[in-house]
């Protein structure tokens, strides 16, 4: 689109490729090759371009303002690699140096200047992956995500984080070995503190240089795709860093943030909230995420802190009701609908995932029916309930068995993703393994049971790094994972267990083919409170099934009986208590032939030994003839 159309659509909130208009761009004007610079600062008294090519303040270049509040200038002084900023004079007369909000490259800390660099055109080799992704989608495919903080998965001997060139060599083989389908990174956009988690951003188009270069991340994504691994990145469109040299009060007045002081300030996080109803902000944010999807070939976006965008009273600070007297933030609601509409029109096969904890808004519902249009929502209720249950002494579990079963009441009210994320292994919450009840042996048994339950429960899966091998200490963002734990036999066996469990998940269609309706699950018994045993069936469209049985008590149950719908010889295909994974069983249960006899609504029974704190999964090995009628369900 030409410059006039780019400017018009920016002001109407319809420019979703803003990086082609604002920022620095190499152009030829009147026979001179140079760079055009454009920045939105509608209420600034003046804006000057300064940088290496002006000797900074000595020869700063004045910029001209157009009718939409965009300041621009063309100059042939800059060269590739030069650093620049905008010197913005506010209405008060104060001058302040600001970053270029559209910069793709920022200088290394402690500086925050933008770097003039021509974005190279990558010749991608992942066409087959993208074609398969488009053909298959993801709703009826396995999705098992390994969540990673790029700065602390592994570190160099000098304590510096791995670059993505290093992660390409180490992390991708690990993902393949561990049989994950996707990897999700905490924010990779530029943020002020390199050792932070990255959720207060300053550069929405810039790659965080702590982790290397944009080109290195492109190569990482490509290599993931060549190894059949999808890549998801966290994105924060609700709030941004309060740092003076970034987006905050860019021209001296509320520019990217709300006009109202209390709405603009996120008191709980010490950040500023985007004015999601402002057209220019919508163009900026949607352009940001489209750029990341297009430039890096991302397979999914996890939108952080959605509740903060939906509810006026989400923060701990003062708030004012909306025009209807309620707490709904209509600007945030409509922005998220529009965001998903735009992304889905361009990339229907890219996952849009919401981190959202309330039940007051339909997050994954159809936009036409009032939903927000996300593909998945984190199931925070399930996660909180299930962790509380597994931390509890088994003596009391029968009184709280509803913590395990309650999710079946609402499991398909949204398209859920089941997260054991970074948020659950910090700030004194203990690591996932350390949360488990009992001594060291029982903690590992509990963790094997828990991860198997997550894999069998309807919904896509996410596990934060370190939990796969039972790291004992909490996650520390300034240190690498406790890889030395793997010198311990129990941790090494736990790692092998998780890798095998992930492969089992991928190889068994009943666990993922029907994740969005009750057609994919049938409860056998959710009422065995006294023994703390839960059993259900996962199914495919063709009727293939897995019988999943979970013993949440440290008591081995011999001659344990459940009902099954089909007369058959059944074989145990999964047992969490095998010796090779740290348990005490030397081998699986023997195959068992079902017996005729009514058990609840089931015409057949299956009797076997259920391991203590164990999970046992069975499948049909061979059907047999029976006079009994099939289960009426």
UniProtKB/Swiss-Prot annotation:
Enzyme Commission number: 2.4.1.18
Enzyme class (EC, first level): transferase
Disulfide bonds: none
Pfam families: Alpha-amylase, Alpha-amylase_C, CBM_48
Pathway: Glycan biosynthesis; glycogen biosynthesis
Keyword field: Carbohydrate metabolism, Glycogen biosynthesis, Glycogen metabolism, Glycosyltransferase, Transferase
GO CC annotation: cytosol
GO BP, sorted A to Z: glycogen biosynthetic process
Catalytic machinery residues: 304 (nucleophile), 355 (proton donor)
Taxonomic superkingdom: Bacteria
SMART domains to which the protein is assigned, alphabetical: Aamy
Reactions this protein catalyses: Transfers a segment of a (1->4)-alpha-D-glucan chain to a primary hydroxy group in a similar glucan chain
GO MF annotation: an example: cation binding
UniProt similarity note: Belongs to the glycosyl hydrolase 13 family. GlgB subfamily.
Known partners and oligomeric status: Monomer.
Function comment: Catalyzes the formation of the alpha-1,6-glucosidic linkages in glycogen by scission of a 1,4-alpha-linked oligosaccharide from growing alpha-1,4-glucan chains and the subsequent attachment of the oligosaccharide to the alpha-1,6 position.
Protein name: 1,4-alpha-glucan branching enzyme GlgB
Organism the protein comes from: Streptococcus gordonii (strain Challis / ATCC 35105 / BCRC 15272 / CH1 / DL1 / V288)
